Amino acid sequence: LTIYFYHTRLTRESYEEWKDYKFPGHILYGLPLLEKYGIRSVMHKYKAFPSRLKLMLYATKEILCCKEPYEVLYGTSFRGLELIILLRALGLYRKPIVIWHHTALKTSSRKIRERISRFFYKGIDHMFLFSKKLIKDSLATGKAPEEKLQLIHWGPDLAFYDHLLQTMPDRKPEGFISTGKENRDVDTMLQAFCATDQQLDLYIAPTNGSVNYQQIIERFCLPDSVRVHYTDGVIPYLLAQKVARKSCVVKIGRAH
């Protein structure tokens, strides 16, 4: 079996880094394991675009013009694949589409948007989700039958982190750290740490989607014990090193 492996970040480069324990395998969504099962990957040539539309147009062109044969389109997200999925729903794209869906499917109060959404999901042949709760909530929308949804236990690449710790034998963990950018409740986190003298290092992107974390953070008068570091791009190895030097990881999710 040959798949077209679509990822929303650099793939081939990250895969090579994974081989040298410089990139955690779980961010590659199974790519390091595929060869073991006789699955060959045609890797998407990723490019970053500030515009969602430009990303969709680029991804559509790359996929439709791909000269290497493949049987299945496998996406770690549907971001950028929207036009291909609509073509599949229309019967104009013939390859099965399998994607990771990172949230539960939702219903819209707007009738036109809801109709488009229901048609859109007809173009996805199979979806992987992270929990039974996400599957249950998705089924409640009626947009996908149960046989299309599959629970996959996604977790950290332990070999990557074990190897990292072996390279830091003299580390002395101290303080708190928080990393990441998706649905982070920085309001609650900063309120809590501003009320203590505990040391916190926060590594976060200035913005993520419609959320401007920098604006939220700048409303606070932060004590010296709370340090904010704005990140750019995907830097899992660097952040893993930072985390390994801390006593505790803090993550407070923002309600959807």
Task: State the predicted function of each range.
Residues 204, 213-248:
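Nucleotide-activated donor-binding/catalytic signature segment of Leloir-type glycosyltransferases, i.e.
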Residues 125-149, 156-161:
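A short, active-site helix/loop in glycosyltransferases that binds the activated sugar's phosphate group
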